[in-house]
Structure formats: C-alpha cells, structure tokens
Amino acid sequence: MESLRIGNRTVSYRAYGRDVDAQRPPVVLVHGAGGNHLMWPAQVRHLPNTAVYALDLPGHGASPGPSTSDISAYSEIVRDFVDALELPWFLLAGHSMGGAIALDFALAYAYRLAAIMVVGGGARMRVASPLLEGVVHDFEATTATITDYSYHPDTPAAEKELYLRHLRESDPHVLYGDFVACHNFDVVDRLPTLTTPALFVCGLQDRMTPPERSIYLHNHVGGSELLLVDNAGHNVMIEQPQQVADSLQAFLAKVAL
C-alpha cells in the first residue's frame, strides 16, 4: 500500500484506475467503523475509466493510530488526505460511519465535491448501549452480533466469517471510538443546507441502519437519488457489489464535467 504523512498521522491507501477519463471526478472511498479499505469490493474499487482512492482511516487496516472518536475530526483527516493527493474535485463515498463522514464533509467543504454516495447511512446514527459497552467488555460476542446484523439472513456463513475475521483484527478501543463518533453524529437540522449531489444506497434488509434512514436522507436532501437494494443488509456493497458499482458508475456519469 501507499502512504501519506498528514500532520502527526500516516494514512495508508490504495490507488486504482487505468485509462482514466479526465471528465469524470476521482472517487475517494471511506470505510465504516472498525473497517478498512477492503470493505469496498473489487467491483467498486476498480471502476472503469475512473481514478479511485481507498484509504484506511488512522488506527484502521494498515494506517497506524491514533484514531479519533469524532466524525468531524475524521472528516478533517479526509480533507487533509485529498489535499495531499492534490484532488481539487472528487466524489466522496462512505459506508456507515464513512457515510457520516461524507455527509459531514459535504456540509463543511461542499466546494471540494462533485458528489457524495452514502451507503447504509443516516442523518443520526445512535448506537445501542449493548454494542457500545460490549465492544470493550465482550469483544468476541459483540463482534459476532455486529456481523450477524450486518448481513442479509441468507448470506452464506463463509462470507460472514470473512467479515468477522476482518472486524476482529481491529483494536477494540478503536472500534469503541468509532461507535462513539457515530453515536454523537447528528446532522438532522442541517440537511436542508446540503447542496452537493447525493446518492443514498441501502440494503432493504439492513438491520443496522434500516432503509427508513436512507429514505429520510433522500426526502430531506434536494435533488438526491435513492437506491434500495433487495437481498442485502448493512454491507450491501459486499452483498450486491455489481449493483452498487453499476449505480455508482451511472451516478458518476451524471456529475462528470
């Protein structure tokens, strides 16, 4: 992986893209709580004719800590990351906590964005107390619960086991901080001021951030688009990767220069 020194942090990332169409904005992918860049499937990371940058937030994946427990602080890290890459204009895509980061970024730095894609997100992201406390006090059982609730009930066991293994590679204190960041996130009152083109994506069987939250976002962000994906839960981009990639491709075409 490549890495960038950003202030007192090092951010690792992978860059993808050949035969890039200069009229299409680059895509920056931000993972969710306790995740890393591999939470984005190959179909999304390897979009045709598009430069794609998938980062590991500090304390996640190949990026050393410290992490943070505040969405706006993560948003500033993303800002510094794209500054270091000299990306003046791009589409920011985020899953779950990454979706909160994308919304926060759009509200703070709209002039930098071509668009955002929020996958499995919400304007408010309260985390249930058993998950918050369990991450610290019973990591094994809590990560198993998170995994179960992150997928459609009919998802093959092997696929869920792979996700669980990735999740358990994370530092419990980093995952706890991520959940605190999500729990304190609330932009309900600010949604009417969001002017960045937005695509909201959610699995119809999402039990972590139910579809109603994406529908709410769509109804309160003018001109936004909504994709509800059947046979998918919270990790919709892993469960139905081609459908999510195709929708992102179509959305990119609309916001290209």
Could you say what each language-model-derived stretch is?
Residues H31-A33, F90, G94-S96, G203:
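Conserved alpha/beta-hydrolase "nucleophile elbow" surrounding the catalytic nucleophile
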Residues E133-T195:
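Conserved alpha/beta-hydrolase catalytic His-Asp/Glu region
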